[in-house]
Amino acid sequence: MNSNTIKTGIDRAPHRSLLKALGLTDRELSKPFIGVVNSFTELVPGHMHLRQVTEAVKAGIRENGGTPFEFSTIAVCDGIAMGHEGMHYSLASREIVADAIEVMAKGHQLDALVLIPSCDKVVPGMLMAAMRLNIPAIVVSGGPMLPGRFEGNPVTLSTVFEGVGQVHAGKKDEAWLHELEAKACPTCGSCAGMFTANSMNCLTEALGMALPGNGTIPAVYSERLVLAKETGYQVMELYRQDLKPRDIVTQSTLKNGVAVDMALGCSTNTILHLPAIANEGDIDWDLGKVNEVSEKTPQICKLAPASETPLAALHEAGGVSAVLKQLLDAGLIDGSTMTVSGVTMAERLKDAKVVDTEIIRPQSNPFSQRGGLRILFGNLAPEGAVIKQGALSSQDFVFEGSAKVFNGEVPAAEAIRNLEIKAGDVVVIRYEGPKGGPGMREMLGPTATLAGMGLDSDVALLTDGRFSGASRGLSIGHVSPEAALGGDIALLKDGDKIRIDIGKGRLEWIVSEEEREQRRQEFAAMAVKPDHLKPELRQGYLGRYAYFVQSASKGAALRRVKE
């Protein structure tokens, strides 16, 4: 076992002395050392209850012959970080999570890991660490929040963001909004729709890295604690079998993940996180393959924000396992991939079934024939851009409009709130990419405000930044190359015509080649490129992040240092 490096032999007496200072017995020292990564924080509703989950995990480890060691890592709440400079740090925190786990696992020679995330960037950060370290590892999250109830309807955090738009449009008053905000988030857990956190927790099941139920058992259910205890027990089985993350997450596994992504209508952020996870396992990722999977994978679930149906309803309908079983029976996923259950995906799914066909529809009656996400290519995005087509009224939507260009989110948000944006406009928010932001901020404020104003089908929003899983409407993100790298989005001016064809997967700037080349020359001649950032954001971690981060088309993963 790895931990023998720090506890066996005469030369390790000092190490054993320090371990005994922790109160460990010789019996405990003789057992495998299992790291339990607790991302508890009092700042994040999705993580506020993780101490209890962690205790259940440790009980399961002890029950099956291991010695657990709890340590912590950071967690950022994207909702609280939204709409101000804090959002620069959200995506960038993913790499800190992965690095912190690497440091602790390597520094203390741990034998296996149980990873306990909940929210947006913590889930992929932990999966990236698992792939990088490649020691036995398993994930159990904190689970989704239950929805609130307001005016007789289920509500989630996205309802509040869209409520802000209703107030700005004069449709509602502040007293109404104040009442809504008090009822939208009634429990602990990750926000209650198919937003980024729940998308990634569901996909963790699809990737085989968590036990069934991880993505959907509500945070407040005792069933979540049972799952945590079983997860702690199961990590010891993984250790004994020497079953590692790279044995589980393969090219076929990732393709399964994309299929489930399409069937569930997950967040566009998954298209950043899946390639970053693949990168850590040295697995090739082709963004264009997403459309191949989407074309043949119907969307069979439609959860908030695409509908009012909360994530908890998916659990009652049969959970991710029921969705996987549908896809397996239709030949849309590979059932031979391994899982942390110690059996193949097909074996794990043999008893899975759909309980509610209104929530998980049959393949013969999907919500749409294509999957929930679409990658767009064209002269504005030769490396790709992404839209959540499952949240549109039609997956063959065509939109042509005039650009309103903003260098950064703040002036765009002000223009929307000041009612300067009209039907037929294409709001372009640039210099918000991984490098240009830096940190690729989410644009939930602008998209939710437009939705609240009733403009989400009449105004497009185009950015080299990204969107919250709670965003809907004509929201196109991850435009690559980004403006800071000289992508054509940097050349746009107010009034330029932009055409979006969802059915054909195209994003085009309608411009002559002569005009485009003239714009390119003007851009190249600019002594100082547009930069809306405060100088302090280039210092510290964000400065280092901006230096190493790659394109969104590569998952905004950091460049590896060359020897």
Swiss-Prot record:
Cofactor note: Binds 1 [2Fe-2S] cluster per subunit. This cluster acts as a Lewis acid cofactor.
Binding locations of [2Fe-2S] cluster: C119, C191
Pathway(s): Amino-acid biosynthesis; L-isoleucine biosynthesis; L-isoleucine from 2-oxobutanoate: step 3/4; Amino-acid biosynthesis; L-valine biosynthesis; L-valine from pyruvate: step 3/4
Substrates-to-products reaction catalysed: (2R)-2,3-dihydroxy-3-methylbutanoate = 3-methyl-2-oxobutanoate + H2O; (2R,3R)-2,3-dihydroxy-3-methylpentanoate = (S)-3-methyl-2-oxopentanoate + H2O
GO cellular component, one term: cytosol
Complexes and interactors: Homodimer.
Protein name per Swiss-Prot or TrEMBL: Dihydroxy-acid dehydratase
Lineage: Bacteria, Bacillati, Bacillota, Clostridia, Eubacteriales
Name of the gene this protein is made from: ilvD
